[in-house]
């Protein structure tokens, strides 16, 4: 039995959001084919995460150095550790997100900030930082209305690139992607492109 964490970073309704279509198709297929796995679903917009700023940085630094925390600092550290422990405990993690304005939604960026903790997801060494999450299996389900996999727009893609960079920093190398792109750019092919992506998501779920 595996512990699996499903993370959704899109609050648009499914009929309007391709990444949500991928998420729902993947989740349904995974549950049907892995009935004994322990699954946690995390809707980042519903979680309403506070931005990761000075208060949380200070709280986590003090906690990591054995310094007594105030009641407010302890509350903030507990919130970060809630998501951090949930992530580190998972054997498999699924991220579903759109590309908005060339990058990920702010809630996903905040979530990744929570998880980037020295001594937890990575550590510092004399030779440089070393990732600690190398045993994780990750799937990325994403959508972008234009074409960013090649051509002049490729350099502007900072959504999947960002997530993969952070995961790599944490030592995660087992990453599989399902990307739907161009469905807004090529309206006449939109249904076909989305359907193909959903089919890929289902197949990935069955073998994930």
Curated annotation (Swiss-Prot):
Major enzyme class: oxidoreductase
Record note on quaternary structure: Homodimer.
UniProt-annotated binding residues for FMN: 99-102
Species: Brevibacillus brevis (strain 47 / JCM 6285 / NBRC 100599)
Record's cofactor remark: Binds 1 FMN per subunit.
Cofactor list: FMN
Protein name (record): FMN-dependent NADH:quinone oxidoreductase
An annotated Gene Ontology molecular function: oxidoreductase activity, acting on NAD(P)H, quinone or similar compound as acceptor
EC number(s) from the headed UniProt entry: 1.6.5.-, 1.7.1.17
Entry keyword Endoplasmic reticulum: no
UniProt keyword terms in alphabetical order: Flavoprotein, FMN, NAD, Oxidoreductase
Function: Quinone reductase that provides resistance to thiol-specific stress caused by electrophilic quinones.
NCBIfam families assigned to the protein according to its UniProt record, in alphabetical order: PRK13556.1
Family listed: Belongs to the azoreductase type 1 family.
Catalytic reactions of this protein: 2 a quinone + NADH + H(+) = 2 a 1,4-benzosemiquinone + NAD(+); N,N-dimethyl-1,4-phenylenediamine + anthranilate + 2 NAD(+) = 2-(4-dimethylaminophenyl)diazenylbenzoate + 2 NADH + 2 H(+)
């Amino acid at each position: 039995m595996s512990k699996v964490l499903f993370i959704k970073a899109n609050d648009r309704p499914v009929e309007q959001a391709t990444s949500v279509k991928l998420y729902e198709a993947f989740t349904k297929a995974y549950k049907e084919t892995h009935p004994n796995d322990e699954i946690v679903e995390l809707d980042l917009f519903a979680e309403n995460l506070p931005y990761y700023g000075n208060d949380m940085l200070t709280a986590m630094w003090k906690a990591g150095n054995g310094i007594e925390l105030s009641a407010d600092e302890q509350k903030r550290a507990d919130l970060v550790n809630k998501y951090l422990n949930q992530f580190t405990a998972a054997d498999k993690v699924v991220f579903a997100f759109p590309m908005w304005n060339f990058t990920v939604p702010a809630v996903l960026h905040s979530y990744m900030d929570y998880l980037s903790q020295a001594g937890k997801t990575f550590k510092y060494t004399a030779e440089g930082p070393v990732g600690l999450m190398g045993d994780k299996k990750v799937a990325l389900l994403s959508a972008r209305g234009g074409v960013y996999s090649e051509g002049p727009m490729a350099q502007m893609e900072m959504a999947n690139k960002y997530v993969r960079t952070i995961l790599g920093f944490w030592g995660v190398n087992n990453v599989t992607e399902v990307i739907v792109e161009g469905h807004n750019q090529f309206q006449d092919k939109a249904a076909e492109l989305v359907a193909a992506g959903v089919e890929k998501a289902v197949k990935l779920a069955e073998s994930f």
